[in-house]
């Protein structure tokens, strides 16, 4: 599952450097397709422009990319990484649905969890750490329906539940796994009692 936002705790510049290296391997028209429509393109670039004007730093700009390969028609955006995003920016509060990742910086783990929980959406969250205690805190406190530890949240296969919390919730059940079977199951409750008195009571 793609992540829309990274909340970095402490010194994360070395992680961002690696992200830039990997993101540049995504080539529009070669191994990165276009967004679905002109409206989507304008919406996504609008998020980027607003964040830039509000003081965020564009580390990798995917606007107006050079498109390689034969499939050049389409609304292409290259991978985009935006640092120093703040919670008052629209890009931090809404779903982008594009090749864009926003980086929000937090002073410590408590602040990072507060940032995650302040978001109205709660589909999934992931934590990357070598501390079992920190991982446990995120698993227990993050307001999300799916949690990944040292792995980007995998979209589960049918036997596992898939669903979020808050504004990402589908309803009373997840769309896969046991609860999806329960959703489509029509329950019937039957209560029985058998004893010798049944032969002589007033309803026999």
Labelled PLM ranges:
Residues 19, 47, 135-138:
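Aromatic/hydrophobic pocket-lining residues that form π-stacking "cages" and hydrophobic walls in ligand
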Residues 35-45:
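Short beta-strand to alpha-helix junction loop
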Residues 36, 59-62, 127:
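Short beta-strand segments
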């Amino acid at each position: 599952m793609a992540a829309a936002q990274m909340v970095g705790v402490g010194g994360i510049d070395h992680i961002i450097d690696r992200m830039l290296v990997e993101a540049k391997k995504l080539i529009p028209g070669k191994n990165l397709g276009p967004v679905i429509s002109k409206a989507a393109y304008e919406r996504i670039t609008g998020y980027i422009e607003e964040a830039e004007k509000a003081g965020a730093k564009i580390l990798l700009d995917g606007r107006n990319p050079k498109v390689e390969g034969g499939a050049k028609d389409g609304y292409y955006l290259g991978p985009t990484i935006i640092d120093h995003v703040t919670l008052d920016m629209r890009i931090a509060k809404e779903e982008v649905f594009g090749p864009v990742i926003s980086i929000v910086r937090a002073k410590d783990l408590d602040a990072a969890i507060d940032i995650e929980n302040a978001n109205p959406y709660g589909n999934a969250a992931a934590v990357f750490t070598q501390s079992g205690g920190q991982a446990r805190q995120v698993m227990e406190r993050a307001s999300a329906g799916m949690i990944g530890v040292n792995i980007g949240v995998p979209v589960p296969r049918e036997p596992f539940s898939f669903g979020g919390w808050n504004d990402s919730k589908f309803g009373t059940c997840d769309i896969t796994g046991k609860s999806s079977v329960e959703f489509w199951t029509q329950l019937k409750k039957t209560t029985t009692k058998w004893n010798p008195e049944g032969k002589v009571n007033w309803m026999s």
